[in-house]
């Protein structure tokens, strides 16, 4: 009984200290997304939130803050908080009651492995280009809810751990930042190798027969990799996901995160 109570207390404590995000796409026609984040149990007098200036696998500075506007911050009661800035990519927020909510508009129109793209065909998200973070809270778990457009038949594909519906989780900021996401009316194929799932998510306008042909080639490459190395890696949650977007509106790029692969081309 004591162990159960201790476990329950620990679970509630972790939940209270989870940073949560939501993102919605009502104005996708103008390449805009609305991002909201909540940072609970903040102990410091101020909290610095910022946009990243780098991205996994990209050895250059990218000023992602240039695509953010309409920033505002409130406390747990919904009251506005004082915000100061001392550089182009950070916001310093005064803490009044331990809860800090932020909201901003993201402009996104470069689909690839570095930036993000939002339009009426999809939301193609590179996490560092999309979500603010608090460096002092980087070890906290994260929950993210993608408000996918039902009127456009959007679904969510990502390497993040699925919780329920369109809500996913990451154990910390590092994992979150390395988890690109494709939200669209995509198609998918999958097969099992040694008890693990290899999934291919494809967002493109081509017929199913072309996807079937492509998928057989992908499977052959995966199996050949296993033959060369003797085994496949142990993937998180038993799954590896290819996230492919082949469309005239993307920029053309690729990137290899931890348990997924971004592929874009025109």
Where are these regions (language model features)?
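Surface-exposed beta-strand/loop patches in extracellular or lumenal glycoproteins
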Residues: 33-65, 132-134, 138-149, 156
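Juxtacatalytic substrate-recognition/specificity segment
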Residues: 187-266
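Non-catalytic, glycine-rich low-complexity segments
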Residues: 17-27, 37-38
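Zn2+-dependent metallopeptidase catalytic core
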Residues: 64-67, 107, 139-157, 169-175, ...
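Extracellular structured ligand-interaction cores
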Residues: 34, 68, 88, 99, ...
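Extended, low-hydrophobicity, Ser/Thr/Pro/Gly-biased non-transmembrane segments
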Residues: 103-186
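Bacterial Sec-dependent N-terminal signal peptides
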Residues: 1-21
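A surface-exposed beta-strand-loop module
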Residues: 25-26, 57-120, 134-136
């Amino acid at each position: 009984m004591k162990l159960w109570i201790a476990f329950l207390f620990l679970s509630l404590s972790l939940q209270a200290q989870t940073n949560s995000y939501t993102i919605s796409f009502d104005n996708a026609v103008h390449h805009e997304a609305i991002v909201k984040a909540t940072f609970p149990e903040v102990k410091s007098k101020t909290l610095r939130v910022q946009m990243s200036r780098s991205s996994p696998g990209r050895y250059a500075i990218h000023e992602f803050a240039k695509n953010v506007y309409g920033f505002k911050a409130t406390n747990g009661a919904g009251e506005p908080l004082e915000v100061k800035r001392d550089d182009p990519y950070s916001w310093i927020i005064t803490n009044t009651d331990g809860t800090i909510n932020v909201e901003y508009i993201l402009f996104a129109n470069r689909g690839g492995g570095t930036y993000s793209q939002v339009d009426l065909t999809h939301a193609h998200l590179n996490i560092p280009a999309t979500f603010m973070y608090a460096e002092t809270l980087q070890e906290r778990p994260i929950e993210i809810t993608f408000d996918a457009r039902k009127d456009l038949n959007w679904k969510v594909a990502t390497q993040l751990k699925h919780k329920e519906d369109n809500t996913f989780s990451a154990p910390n900021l590092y994992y979150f930042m390395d988890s690109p996401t494709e939200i669209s009316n995509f198609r998918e194929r999958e097969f099992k190798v040694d008890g693990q799932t290899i999934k291919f998510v494809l967002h493109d306008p081509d017929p199913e027969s072309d996807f079937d042909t492509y998928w057989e080639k992908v499977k052959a490459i995966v199996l050949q990799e296993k033959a060369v190395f003797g085994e496949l890696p142990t993937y998180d949650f038993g799954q590896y996901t290819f996230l492919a977007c082949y469309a005239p509106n993307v920029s053309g790029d690729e990137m290899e995160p931890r348990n997924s692969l971004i592929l874009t081309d025109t």
